[in-house]
Amino acid sequence: MHIQPTEATLGAQVTGVDLRQPLSDADFARIEDAWHRYAVLIFPNQHLSEEQHLAFTRRFGRLELSIRRNGSNLSRLSNIKDGAVVPPTSLQARFLVGNTYWHSDSSYKRVGAKASLLAAHVVPSTGGETEWADMRAAYDALEPDMKKWLEGKMAVHSYEYSHKPFGGMEILATEELKHLVPVEHAVVKTHPATGRKNLFVGRHASHILGEDLEESRALLARLTEEGAQSPRTYKHAWRPGDLVIWDNRCVLHRGHRWPDDQARVMVRSTVAGDDPDNEWVMPEDAAA
């Protein structure tokens, strides 16, 4: 196995390992250590089946229940319906546009996602990349006075706030939306495995509690945009079969647009946050 860091402050490419085969404990420990260090790991040319994708995912923890609460283990992020590319004005396409803004998966839940594993199945001829931003290095780059001011601050994260402009309230049933009430997360978090501090912001963060609404929204947007600058970002051009895992606890990500008439099919699994009372754990994993 070879682990080659990118030139950014995050990300490494892992080669010489076949994720279609069961991993030894030693090999997985090396992968997990690299993941904690680099936060984003790229595994080229894996071509995993759904079962293999899920088996690797479960090495990192329990599976997260999707917002549809339909028991699905995998989320299909696609602009295909009934065998054809959907028009850009369709609800399905509009919903995907929201993913082009920086975010941490599931931060609008009480317990945000631990990890996401995204596999490329069909990719467009141009565009459609995914980009990650290192919020550990973003925190490190802040002025001391800003670090001090942010300490202890709580932000409200809201599914409605981030998804309503992109049809997110229409795509879910009323019963599903009942489970997606606004939640609070610390603006500065400490990673449980590394002890490093990082910003926890992105599109789902609506405002900072106890501060002026518009001023705090502007600050959150500035922290996100200024944090997501080189050398703290890595952008991956997908090839079919690629798999990437990232740490939602300390990394933001966004997708890039691609030609509206070209297909893009990605499959994602999500590892639930390590909270024993996490209500978003898949039922079959809840007792694990």
Which functions belong to the PLM regions below?
Residues 1-243, 249-288:
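Non-heme Fe(II) oxygenase catalytic core, chiefly the N-lobe of the double-stranded beta-helix
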